[in-house]
Swiss-Prot record:
Disulfide bonds join C36-C102. GO terms for molecular function: FAD binding; oxidoreductase activity. It is found in: Secreted, Cell wall. Belongs to the oxygen-dependent FAD-linked oxidoreductase family. Its EC number is 1.1.1.-. Binds 1 FAD per subunit in a bicovalent manner. Transmembrane segments: none annotated. This is Berberine bridge enzyme-like 23. Keywords: Cell wall, Disulfide bond, FAD, Flavoprotein, Glycoprotein, Nucleotide-binding, Oxidoreductase, Secreted, Signal. GO terms for cellular component: extracellular region; plant-type cell wall. Residues 80-256 form the FAD-binding PCMH-type domain.
Length: 532
């Protein structure tokens, strides 16, 4: 394990980019790219200069700085890799198609960005150059169809924009995606998509019913029927960036009650916190499917505290008796609870009361101006109290550690582990997201916090899933292993692939071998092609 961690860190030190200092002016590819795009122009094709941004443009500079600010850890490492030769912000299918064809013709790598929330920056940074960023920010139309209770969502939209559009169309519909509104649907849906309604309705990916997609040859598939069930299966949880570019998703809307109930209850360590968290582990995945209670562990006032944060698809009058019967240890009261609409519950999870609904349209990254490192786990058996106490002790060693524990069960147990690439279903009690944040730009401070995270992860190994130790793709972690260029073998990639996908990884690699046998769409943790 130490060898793997040292290898990951050593690669990390030459990975990604300190954009403010790097220079790609020596690369001839940007002018060749523009020439290629112009050559492919036709009457329906807008002047490529209107959506292709060179390093000397204001759009490029502002875009680069905004992306780096999503995790300043990349700046602390003083990376020396090349910055993108161009940033492409297409508006149409044709512009996306032509961008891919020219990239392939010129040997230029592609990084496809939806919301830019990849924890390791793989949607906008690259170890290898030259590369472009294909930013789908202008591909975010949303069409709600209440007649058949579906929506077509452009891959560049955020889940906040989707929630907003649903709320403006209906008071009795919602969608089971994440609680962070600025996350892009392109990555969120294609990696699975946890959310507060997943116990009732499953992951976001479980509710995708169709898609439009373009492959490395520029071929556009306008439906799942055209692309085939294998590819459609792969992009709903297997990370679409390994296979091509999703243009849009068709999702199934779900019915929500006119009133839902939320609560947020803080418990300091002195108030029997350990025993209550231990009890939560035993019951959270077995509760009524309408009830989602997650636990957030953090430091407050120099001491460890937990926040029990919940969303119940129903009224207070039904929630309180349920809690008294199943989880009386928490001591929930009417005063702790608030009834609201489903869309207001999304606001409740993110902002203080009184924020306008339009706040959901803010595409800004929630972790702006922070440095952070994250990891994930899945827990199959309750962690004993002594194990929890070991976590609390370690939380006092750094300034801003966070651990979010989200329960599975319900619909998550009804869906088989091979129905989508996301395999972490029945048998898993809850997922853990670990994160440590800091603000000081200093290599020593960065090393301290990243080392702390890795030591906590090592400590947790006896309490979590094993063989393989599960991980969640949308909480990407390059410590698990990385590809070594275009020729990474399936056997080498299994090191990290089985962590994310279990036995589904082989099927993903076979699909990759059919749709992208030359491995054009690749990054440091993309699925390698397996030709059979």
């Amino acid at each position: 394990m130490r060898t793997l961690e040292a290898f990951a860190l050593s690669l990390f030190l030459v990975f990604l980019v300190k954009w403010v200092n790097s220079d790609s002016s020596s690369s001839p590819s940007k002018d060749q790219f523009l020439s290629c795009m112009s050559t492919h122009s036709d009457s329906s094709f807008i002047n490529p200069k209107s959506f292709i941004h060179k390093p000397d443009s204001r759009v490029y500079t502002d875009f680069s700085q905004s992306l780096i600010s999503q995790n300043y850890r990349f700046l602390t490492l003083n990376f020396t890799s090349q910055k993108p030769i161009l940033i492409v912000t297409p508006r149409t299918d044709t512009e996306i198609q032509r961008s891919l064809l020219c990239s392939r013709k010129l040997g230029v790598k592609v990084r496809t960005k939806s919301g830019g929330h990849d924890y390791e920056g793989l949607s906008y940074l690259s170890l290898h150059s030259p590369f472009i960023i294909l930013d789908l920010v202008n591909v975010r139309s949303i069409e709600i169809n209440l007649a058949d209770e579906t929506a077509w969502v452009g891959a560049g939209a955020t889940i906040g924009e989707l929630y907003y559009k649903i709320a403006k169309s209906s008071k009795i519909h919602g969608f089971p995606a994440g609680t962070c509104p600025s996350v892009g649907v392109g990555g969120h849906f294609s990696g699975g998509g946890f959310g507060a309604m997943m116990r009732k309705h499953g992951l976001a990916a479980d509710n995708v019913v169709d898609a439009r997609f373009v492959d490395a040859n520029g071929r556009i598939y306008n439906s799942r029927r055209e692309m085939g069930e294998d590819l459609f299966w792969a992009i709903r949880g297997g990370g679409a960036a390994s296979f091509g570019v999703v243009l849009s998703w068709k999702v199934k809307l779900v019915r929500v009650p006119e009133k839902v109930t939320c609560f947020r209850r803080n418990l300091p360590l002195t108030q029997n916190m350990t025993k209550i968290v231990h009890r939560w582990q035993q019951i959270a995945a077995e509760l009524d499917d309408n009830l989602f209670i997650r636990v957030i562990v953090s430091i407050s006032g120099g001491s460890v505290q937990t926040t029990f944060q919940a969303n119940y698809l129903g009224g207070i009058d039904k929630l309180i008796p349920l809690m008294n019967q199943k989880f009386p240890e928490l001591g929930l009261t009417f005063q702790d609870c608030s009834e609201m609409t489903w869309i207001d519950s999304i606001m409740y999870f993110n902002w203080k009361k009184g924020q306008p609904l339009e706040t959901l349209l803010d595409r800004g990254q929630r972790y702006n101006d922070l440095y952070f490192k994250a990891k994930s786990d899945f827990v199959k058996n309750p962690i004993p109290e002594i194990g929890l106490e070991g976590i609390w002790t370690r939380f006092h060693e750094v300034e801003s550690p966070i651990m979010i524990m989200e329960p599975l069960g319900g619909k998550m147990y009804e869906i088989g582990e091979t129905e989508t690439p996301f395999p972490h279903r029945r048998g898993n009690l809850y997922n853990i997201q670990y994160m440590v944040k800091w603000r000081l730009k200093d290599i020593g401070v960065m090393e301290k916090h990243v080392t702390w995270m890795r030591l906590l992860y090592r400590y947790m190994r006896v309490y979590v899933s094993a063989s393989p130790r599960g991980a969640y793709l949308n909480y990407r972690d390059l410590d698990l292993g990385m590809n070594r260029g275009v020729n990474t073998s399936f056997e080498d990639a299994k090191l990290w692939g089985f962590r994310y996908f279990g036995s589904n990884f082989k099927r993903l690699a076979i699909v990759k071998g059919k749709i992208d046998p030359t491995n054009f769409f690749r990054n440091e943790q993309s699925v390698p092609p397996l030709i059979v």
